[in-house]
Amino acid sequence: MADVVVGIQWGDEGKGKIVDRIAKDYDFVVRYQGGHNAGHTIVHKGVKHSLHLMPSGVLYPKCKNIISSAVVVSVKDLCEEISAFEDLENRLFISDRAHVILPYHAKKDAFKEKSQNIGTTKKGIGPCYEDKMARSGIRMGDLLDDKILEEKLNAHFKAIEPFKKAYDLGENYEKDLMGYFKTYAPKICPFIKDTTSMLIEANQKGEKILLEGAQGTLLDIDLGTYPFVTSSNTTSASACVSTGLNPKAINEVIGITKAYSTRVGNGPFPSEDTTPMGDHLRTKGVEFGTTTKRPRRCGWLDLVALKYACALNGCTQLALMKLDVLDGIDAIKVCVAYERKGERLEAFPSDLKDCTPIYQTFKGWEKSVGVRKLDDLEPNAREYIRFIEKEVGVKIGLISTSPEREDTIFL
């Protein structure tokens, strides 16, 4: 059976800590979408690890880690991540169906961002998915056969010729790209496998599989705050499509949310707090992007968005992260509905334009940091947790009270 860990906000919810905390109980941890535009930060024994492509199970020697087919892979960046770990043989597997991000994709991404101003990371994620949908992409499995790779690259060179100047690819792009693959392909190829068959077999044997999403539900290309979204499907349903596991294989869906809200880049954010309180949340929560180091926009918990995300993903339980960031705040707000043109909205609309938050205010608490038992939380903190559970209709199974792995309350 497989369990899914999925972000139910705009990403950066703390999925990495949760996966790291529970990965020891699984045979496989699988990253199922996105690229190196995402980042997980894990603190293990006082050491901070920043992962962008590697599944969060790499810190457990007995855990097998898979990068599955809907992930887009920068071979250069993955090689750099691999070099930081030892003994990955028979512990890391990359789907032969996953698509390769080319340097051209990053150049195109940067070019388009100048006019679109979506707030992308300019890592080439979107353009790589574009080539995938156009059926002209290069897949990881192509790196295993020099002849096939050469054919695919020649087709790529022909296709991008009219755009070389606009995308600032340089006169030696073809030669440089050939050298790029000669440098990195030998380091990556030993890890490339048919992970679809591997996971189907593991599921049939009853092995435990943890499916790890990137970004968050509200950035989903179809169901998120379009056009300010990522280029992949970020919901739990994508886990089945990417891995080849059928929906019957899914057991638990764990939705990850912070005790407040954050967003990176442009796009609507009804509960954003642009007063000094927003700055306080950013500073105390260390809200800066793992990948880009950009400061995250911060605000109050949005229950309209949270209920929507829980319904989309079929969440069976929630993990409430960074409760300790709210320590010491006298009045804590929660967005319980939106108002738009005089109308109260309790359902999440396809367009958040002109939506303003309707808040309910709660009394704060002094300290929750480091608490590991529910009964040790102050009454106001417990009331806040109970309110979220009641409004969303999904039980909270886990609460994080610091970045440390052990500072976790299990319910």
Swiss-Prot record:
Protein name according to UniProt: Adenylosuccinate synthetase
Pathway(s) per entry: Purine metabolism; AMP biosynthesis via de novo pathway; AMP from IMP: step 1/2
Gene Ontology annotations of biological process type: 'de novo' AMP biosynthetic process; IMP metabolic process
Family from the record: Belongs to the adenylosuccinate synthetase family.
Residues annotated to bind GTP: 11-17, 39-41, 296, 322-324, 400-402
Residues that hold IMP according to the record: D12, E13, G14, K15, N37, A38, G39, H40, T121, R135, Q215, T230, R294
Gene: purA
Subunit and interaction comment: Homodimer.
GO molecular function terms noted in the UniProt entry: adenylosuccinate synthase activity; GTP binding; magnesium ion binding
Classification via Pfam families: Adenylsucc_synt
CDD domains assigned: AdSS (cd03108)
One Gene Ontology term, aspect cellular component: cytoplasm
Cellular compartment(s): Cytoplasm
Species of origin: Helicobacter pylori (strain J99 / ATCC 700824) (Campylobacter pylori J99)
Functional note: Plays an important role in the de novo pathway of purine nucleotide biosynthesis. Catalyzes the first committed step in the biosynthesis of AMP from IMP.
Keywords linked to the UniProt accession: Cytoplasm, GTP-binding, Ligase, Magnesium, Metal-binding, Nucleotide-binding, Purine biosynthesis
Listed SUPFAM superfamilies: P-loop containing nucleoside triphosphate hydrolases
Catalytic EC class: ligase
